[in-house]
Amino acid sequence: MITRRQELDMKIFCSEQIQTDYLQIGRREFCMSLIAALVAGPAKLAVSHDAQTFQLRYIVGSSMYGRMALTDVLSEVRNAGAQHIDIWPEHHANHREQIETMGHEQFAAILKQYQVELGILTHYDLGPFGLQDEMRVAKKLGGSMVISGSRGPGNLKGQALKAAVREFIEKMKPHIAAAEQMGITIGIENHANSLIDSPDAIRWLAEFTPCRYLGIALSPYHLAQDPVLIAKCITDIGNCLVHFYAWQYGQGCHKKLPKQLELMQLPGRGEMNFVPIVTALKKINYSGWTEVFMHPVPRGIPIMPTAAEVTSEINGVRNYLELCLSREIERTPA
């Protein structure tokens, strides 16, 4: 039986016909597939996926839950189909601060209680040159990645951009060396109005970096909303893709909107078709985390009123992405 929540999700998912260069899915066919997937639930999607060598590996971003108690967030991670947590600080959340308040030992105990592992410490507040202390904390608590934005002039193009990216990598080398020593990966997000904010900048970062301990945390939100372009960016950088945000522009995230419009940042709710994107992830055999993501307005609040509702939205996106992947699989010859 389809729940009322699933019925509402289905109406949103079926609101537009999905078309790509890879295949065309008409509204009726897509909706019928989605009905079957929703009735079966995530378990059936996972079963069909198990037959394939490629799977999306999910991580939960704590900022999706705003400033809720960390225990309430950790209790939802497994329900959201994940095993790892990405911890965010103020002003998007305050879970990094909550860890310091409770102490590292208590945090480790709560992780164990809920059978969750630390994956990432996100720190746009510190910037890429201020992450070494957090690398040590991540290592101590079992994490393997820190994420930040880039530093350098924005709005550059051509050779000026290439030179600035090369200079940024040179400045990052001591931090890359520290990351290598600790076994921590540094993810740099492509963020609007920053040095690394375009496909060219992303490709040059991938070209100039040793990749293993520094790579791109790719945010489709901050790129042109062209799934084929985003897919090409993914295949171009290959194993320099270290993190993927399942996130689109939708109606944006800078002004207060009705909730249903705000949620259009989520894959499956907005207009962008993610089939070419997951196809590209499969093509490069992407093994990093996929983080279902959006920004609420104002920052620091949960994307939905309750933790269970936040998790439901995350699972709706997971169902959509798995359906996109199944469409890619169906078109691939055995």
Residue ranges and their predicted role:
Residues 4-5:
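Basic polycationic patches enriched in arginine
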Residues 8-25, 31-41, 45-57, 68-80, ...:
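Histidine-acidic metal/acid-base catalytic patches
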Residues 34-40, 52, 72, 78, ...:
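Active-site acidic/histidine proton-transfer and metal-coordination neighborhood
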Residues 56-62, 85-87, 118-122, 146-148, ...:
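Hydrophobic faces of well-ordered beta-strands that scaffold small-molecule active sites
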Residues 61-65, 88-90, 123-126, 151-152, ...:
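Active-site beta-loop-alpha junctions enriched in small/polar residues
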Residues 87-106, 156:
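Glycine-rich, proline-tolerant flexible connector loops at the mouths of alpha/beta enzymes
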Residues 90-92, 97, 124, 255-262:
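Vicinal oxygen chelate
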Residues 92-96, 154-159, 225, 298-303:
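A short acidic, helix-capping loop that chelates divalent metal ions and anchors anionic groups
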